[in-house]
């Protein structure tokens, strides 16, 4: 279908929606009305881009994802890099020392399936303690190569997903729980299954049967998938499970669990460096090799992983903000409703309610 026709159809639908006034007392219908309008607006923006329109990184993320990531300067990452320099003493560059450290925590390829199965089972068990999932829900896992992403959930409908894990690069032990939660329970698989059950099947909202990737829905999806890791596991619960189950299953030294996650916790604070590389690269301020070098220097990505990430930027552009900004917005939204010290049941309840509702990123801002 020609792009001009898609744009005209989306514009007409926005006009029709503007003529409909949902009952103010019906919060869900009000959310649905705003959600549909904003999804259609993002479709028009995407069509405009495919037709040749040039947007800055921030203009694009606002148009497509209803959000703009904060700007961070090099100096803001330096304190964390200095901390890592102390935590990882020795000769050579910091990235070389970090890579050497991480190499000791890779999951051997012949143990990968077993480790992921254990992580998935635990994530599912924890999710089922707090969420009622549709009968028959399930997913299968495939291991693939030659992708720009590390993991992907292909939702098949009827409460089933295909989850693909990219094995181009070695997979470290922390990725087992991260991917099991993010792609599966309580992340993308649960998100899509609950939308299908609660909104499409129970309420007849046919629009839920279509997932527009380059839309505000993706910030909610990626944000909840990343925050879902913290919902499923407190820091101490995760360390205990890694120590007693996953490290032994991977043949790794369980006595080093705390050491490993102390380093990873510091590295995680550098996540917004990835946004800055993407912003500068996609704005034309730096080239691809400079973006990869930035990722290596400020986001602590190995050269191979940085190169993979720049391929992701080529494919998905400002989508990168959905992971870290999305997580932060979801975290702020839920903690504003149940507090930072709220009990696990309260947090799960707010989290599941968010998964099963048509909220926009702008709805999450308190």
Feature-to-residue mapping (PLM):
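N-terminal maturation segment of proteins
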Residues: 1-366
């Amino acid at each position: 279908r020609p792009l001009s026709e898609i744009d005209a159809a989306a514009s007409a639908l926005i006009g029709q929606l503007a003529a409909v006034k949902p009952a103010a007392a019906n919060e869900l219908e009000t959310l649905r009305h705003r959600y549909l309008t904003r999804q259609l607006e993002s479709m028009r923006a995407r069509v405009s881009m495919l037709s040749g329109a040039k947007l800055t990184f921030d203009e694009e993320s606002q148009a497509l994802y209803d959000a703009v990531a904060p700007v961070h300067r090099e100096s803001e990452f330096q304190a964390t890099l200095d901390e890592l320099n102390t935590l990882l003493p020795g000769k050579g560059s910091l990235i070389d020392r970090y890579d050497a450290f991480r190499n000791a925590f890779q999951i051997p390829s012949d143990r990968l399936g077993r480790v992921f199965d254990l992580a998935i089972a635990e994530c599912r068990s924890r999710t089922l303690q707090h969420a009622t999932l549709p009968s028959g829900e399930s997913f299968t896992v495939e291991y693939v190569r030659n992708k720009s992403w590390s993991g992907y959930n292909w939702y098949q409908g009827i409460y089933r997903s295909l989850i693909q894990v990219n094995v181009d690069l070695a997979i470290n032990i922390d990725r087992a729980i991260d991917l099991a939660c993010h792609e599966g329970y309580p992340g993308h698989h649960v998100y899509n299954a609950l939308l299908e059950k609660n909104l499409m099947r129970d309420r007849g909202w046919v629009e839920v049967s279509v997932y527009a990737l380059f839309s505000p829905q993706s910030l909610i999806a990626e944000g909840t998938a990343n925050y879902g890791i913290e919902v499923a596991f407190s820091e101490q619960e995760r360390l205990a499970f890694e120590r007693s189950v996953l490290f032994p299953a991977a043949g790794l030294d369980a006595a080093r669990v705390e050491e490993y996650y102390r380093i990873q916790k510091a590295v995680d604070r550098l996540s917004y460096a990835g946004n800055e590389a993407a912003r500068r690269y996609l704005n034309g301020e730096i080239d691809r090799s400079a973006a990869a070098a930035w990722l290596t220097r400020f986001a602590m990505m190995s050269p191979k992983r940085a190169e993979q990430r720049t391929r992701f930027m080529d494919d998905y552009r400002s989508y990168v903000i959905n992971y870290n900004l999305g997580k932060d917005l979801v975290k702020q939204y839920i903690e504003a409703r149940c507090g930072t010290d709220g009990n696990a049941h309260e947090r799960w309840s707010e989290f599941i309610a968010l998964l099963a509702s048509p909220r926009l990123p702008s709805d999450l801002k308190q």
